[in-house]
C-alpha cells in the first residue's frame, strides 16, 4: 500500500534512486496504491548524468510492495521493499530501458506489456 509521502526505490535505469509519492492517481479521494497502480512522484535522489534529475515530477507505476498482492487462489506475493518504474508523463511508457528485480503478473495489461517484457522475472 503506497500513499502520499511514501518513499520508494526505483526499479529501472532512468537515473533515479529514491522517489516520493506525492499523489495517488485515479479518483478524487483515493488514498492507497497497490501493484499496477499509477502514482505521481517526485525524484528525491538521482545519479549524475541520468535521464531524470532531482526535483522532477513524473508518473510511475508501482511494481513491488511490502504489503503484497493477493491472488485468487489465496496466495500472497510479498517483497522486501516498495519499488516503482518511472513513466513518461504523456505516453505512460517507461523512461528506462532496463528493469531490475522481479515484477508481478498483475502488471500484464495492455498498458504495461513493455515493463513485463523488460523484466528479468515475472512472478
From Swiss-Prot:
CDD domains: Ribosomal_uL14 (cd00337). Belongs to the universal ribosomal protein uL14 family. Gene3D superfamilies: Ribosomal protein L14. This is Large ribosomal subunit protein uL14. Keywords: Ribonucleoprotein, Ribosomal protein, RNA-binding, rRNA-binding. The gene is rplN. InterPro entries: Ribosomal_uL14, Ribosomal_uL14_bac-type, Ribosomal_uL14_CS, Ribosomal_uL14_sf. The keyword Ribosomal protein applies. One of its GO terms (biological process) is translation. It comes from Citrobacter koseri (strain ATCC BAA-895 / CDC 4225-83 / SGSC4696). GO terms for molecular function: large ribosomal subunit rRNA binding; structural constituent of ribosome. Part of the 50S ribosomal subunit. Forms a cluster with proteins L3 and L19. In the 70S ribosome, L14 and L19 interact and together make contacts with the 16S rRNA in bridges B5 and B8. Binds to 23S rRNA. Forms part of two intersubunit bridges in the 70S ribosome. The keyword Translocase does not apply. One of its GO terms (cellular component) is cytosolic large ribosomal subunit. It comes from the Bacteria.
